[in-house]
C-alpha cells in the first residue's frame, strides 16, 4: 500500500534498542514502509537497512568525542548526502542530541519532516537548545510527562508516549528457573554489575566494581556477582578486568534483574531500568576531570542518575569521580543487602516510579505519531 520511507537515526545502544522496537511497530502498522538509517545490531535485526554502523559513535565527554571526531564527521557527511540524494518522507532522530540536533538542521534544509524521539535533557542544561528544536523539529515524542508540559509551554508539537521500560515484558521464567539457568543460588545474595556500554566507561568503572566485589566478599562470603554484557560489547573487551567470581551473561538484563538483590550501575538509562524492577542500587560514574569540571559548570542538577531525576525523592546513592571508590561502593552495597529497614525504605520508594512513566506500549505510540506525520 505504501511506498513511503522513514530514516531512523540512533547513535547509542539504548537508542538502537528503541529504534528496533519502533521499527517493529512501524512494520506492523505499515508493512511496506521502507526503513533505513544509522544504528546497530538490534535495528538491523528488526529489518532496518542500517547503512551507518553506530558502534563507534557511542562516546561521552568532550575528550572522548574529540578522539572519535573522524567517525562522527564521516557519519554526518554520509547522512547529509543521503538527505539530498534519497530524501525520506520523515527522519526520526532518537536521543543522541549533540549529533542529532545538528543533523535535524540538515534534514530540515533538505525539506524533510523531522520527529525527535527522546528529548534532549534541556531541563537539565542548555535550555537554549529549545530554539533549535522549535526551528528544526516538527514533533517531539517524549518519555516523561514533565517534558510534555515543558514543550506545550513553548508551543512545540509534542506527544508523551510513555517510557518503554515502564511497559517492558516480565520474564516468563520463575526466579528459581532463572537461577538454575545461570547456575546461581537464589538463597544467597546476588549483586548485578552494570559497568556501562561504552568502552571508556568499562575501562574506568569495571576495575572499581571488581575491587568492590572483593571487599563485599570479605563481609558477605556467600555473595554472588552477575554481569549482563551489553550487546555491543565483546567478552574480550572486558575479560582483562574480570575476576573468576563474576558470572558474565550475554545481554539478558530482564532475567538478571528478576533475581538480583542489589545492583551497582554506571549512570545512564540502565539505572531507571533497575529502579523500575525495584532492585536497590548504587550509581557510580567517572569521566575525565575536565569533562566533569565543565559538567558541573553547565548542569544545574543535584543528581545525574535518571532514576533519581524522575523520582520525587532520591532512590539511589550516587558516587561520582573521587567519591567512587571500591570501599564506598562496597559499603553501600552492604547496607542495601544487610540493613533491612534501609533496604525496605528504598524498595518502597522505587515502587512509586512505574505508574508515572507507563502509558502503554511506547513504540506503538511513537509509530502512530510517525504514521500521522507521513500520511497527513
Curated annotation (Swiss-Prot):
The lineage of its organism: Bacteria, Pseudomonadati, Pseudomonadota, Gammaproteobacteria, Legionellales. It catalyses: a lipid X + a UDP-2-N,3-O-bis[(3R)-3-hydroxyacyl]-alpha-D-glucosamine = a lipid A disaccharide + UDP + H(+). This is Lipid-A-disaccharide synthase. Transmembrane segments: none annotated. GO terms for cellular component: membrane. Pathway: Bacterial outer membrane biogenesis; LPS lipid A biosynthesis. Condensation of UDP-2,3-diacylglucosamine and 2,3-diacylglucosamine-1-phosphate to form lipid A disaccharide, a precursor of lipid A, a phosphorylated glycolipid that anchors the lipopolysaccharide to the outer membrane of the cell. It comes from Coxiella burnetii (strain CbuK_Q154) (Coxiella burnetii (strain Q154)). Belongs to the LpxB family. Pfam families: LpxB.
Amino acid at each position: 500500500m505504501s511506498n513511503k520511507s522513514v530514516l531512523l537515526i540512533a547513535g547509542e545502544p539504548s537508542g538502537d534498542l528503541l529504534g528496533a522496537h519502533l521499527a517493529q511497530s512501524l512494520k506492523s502498522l505499515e508493512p511496506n514502509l521502507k526503513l533505513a538509517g544509522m544504528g546497530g545490531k538490534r535495528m538491523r535485526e528488526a529489518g532496518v537497512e542500517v547503512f551507518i554502523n553506530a558502534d563507534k559513535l557511542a562516546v561521552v565527554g568532550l575528550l572522548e568525542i574529540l578522539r572519535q571526531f573522524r567517525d562522527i564527521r564521516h557519519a554526518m557527511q554520509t547522512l547529509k548526502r543521503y538527505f539530498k540524494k534519497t530524501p525520506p518522507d520523515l527522519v526520526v532522530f532518537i536521543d543522541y542530541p549533540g549529533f542529532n540536533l545538528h543533523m535535524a538542521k540538515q534534514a530540515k534544509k533538505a525539506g524533510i519532516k523531522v520527529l525527535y524521539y527522546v528529548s534532549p535533557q534541556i531541563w537539565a542544561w542548555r535550555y537554549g537548545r529549545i530554539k533549535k528544536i522549535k526551528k528544526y523539529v516538527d514533533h517531539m515524542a517524549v518519555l516523561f510527562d514533565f517534558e510534555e508540559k515543558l514543550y506545550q509551554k513553548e508551543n512545540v508539537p509534542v506527544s508523551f508516549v510513555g517510557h518503554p521500560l515502564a511497559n517492558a515484558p516480565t520474564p516468563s521464567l520463575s526466579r528459581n528457573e532463572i537461577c538454575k539457568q545461570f547456575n546461581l543460588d537464589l538463597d544467597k545474595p546476588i549483586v548485578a554489575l552494570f559497568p556501562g556500554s561504552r568502552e571508556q566507561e568499562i575501562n574506568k568503572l569495571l576495575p572499581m566494581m571488581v575491587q568492590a566485589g572483593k571487599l563485599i566478599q570479605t563481609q558477605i562470603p556467600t555473595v554472588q556477582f552477575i554481569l549482563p554484557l551489553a550487546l555491543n560489547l565483546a567478552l574480550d573487551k572486558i575479560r582483562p578486568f574480570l575476576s573468576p567470581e563474576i558470572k558474565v551473561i550475554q545481554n539478558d538484563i530482564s532475567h538478571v534483574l528478576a533475581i538480583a538483590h542489589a545492583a551497582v550501575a554506571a549512570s545512564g538509562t540502565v539505572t531507571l531500568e533497575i529502579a523500575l524492577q525495584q532492585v536497590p542500587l548504587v550509581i557510580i560514574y567517572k569521566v575525565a576531570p575536565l569533562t566533569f569540571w565543565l559538567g558541573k559548570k553547565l548542569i544545574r542538577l543535584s543528581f545525574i542518575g535518571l532514576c533519581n531525576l524522575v523520582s520525587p525523592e532520591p532512590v539511589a546513592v550516587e558516587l561520582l569521580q573521587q567519591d567512587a571508590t571500591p570501599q564506598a561502593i562496597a559499603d553501600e552495597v552492604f547496607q542495601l543487602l544487610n540493613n533491612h529497614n534501609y533496604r525496605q525504605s528504598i524498595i518502597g520508594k522505587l515502587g512509586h516510579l512505574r505508574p508515572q512513566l507507563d502509558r502503554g506500549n511506547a513504540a506503538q505510540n511513537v509509530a502512530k505519531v510517525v504514521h500521522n506525520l507521513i500520511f497527513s
